[in-house]
Amino acid sequence: MTAKFTVLVLNGPNLNMLGKREPTIYGNQGLSEIIADLGLQADQKNIVLKHLQSNAEHELVDAIHNGYQQVDFIIINPAAFTHTSVAIRDALLSVAIPFIEVHLSNVHAREAFRKHSYLSDIATGVICGFGAQGYSFALDAAYTYLNKAQVDK
């Protein structure tokens, strides 16, 4: 069976340390577990899931550019780049791929500097505060969005 959609999941700096880094804020589940669970969910929906975690901004920008006309949707947890990266914002605008911004913690209930996002105003949606389950919510939302877009054509 041919995949119906391709979704790119991007994770920014320090997310490789999930499960070890501040588990009271970010949870005990490691990123590899989160992506494995998401892969099972994607398989059930006939979605090809691609994933990249990088601590380097330019690698995330390159992955976004490489997704042009190759992926149908992006799920991105930009982590600390949320508050600093005009480059990631511009990359997302340049490819015009719909995307959801995901955060494990509720960034609006944390330090003031975490409340500003360079991506939220251009995102299809934002999910925050649900821990690892936020990725699952994002994949469900992406699937619904893409199916509706096909019907609306």
Swiss-Prot record:
Give the metabolic or biological pathway. Answer: Metabolic intermediate biosynthesis; chorismate biosynthesis; chorismate from D-erythrose 4-phosphate and phosphoenolpyruvate: step 3/7
- Is Chloroplast tagged as a keyword? no
The identity of this protein, by name, is: 3-dehydroquinate dehydratase
Q: Which BP terms from GO are recorded?
A: amino acid biosynthetic process; aromatic amino acid family biosynthetic process; chorismate biosynthetic process; quinate catabolic process
Q: Which InterPro entries match?
A: DHquinase_II, DHquinase_II_CS, DHquinase_II_sf
UniProt site positions, description: Transition state stabilizer = R21
Cite the HAMAP family for this sequence. AroQ
Tell me if Lyase is a UniProt keyword of this record: yes
What does this protein do, in the record's words?
Answer: Catalyzes a trans-dehydration via an enolate intermediate.
* Family the entry assigns: Belongs to the type-II 3-dehydroquinase family.
Q: Which reaction does it catalyse?
A: 3-dehydroquinate = 3-dehydroshikimate + H2O
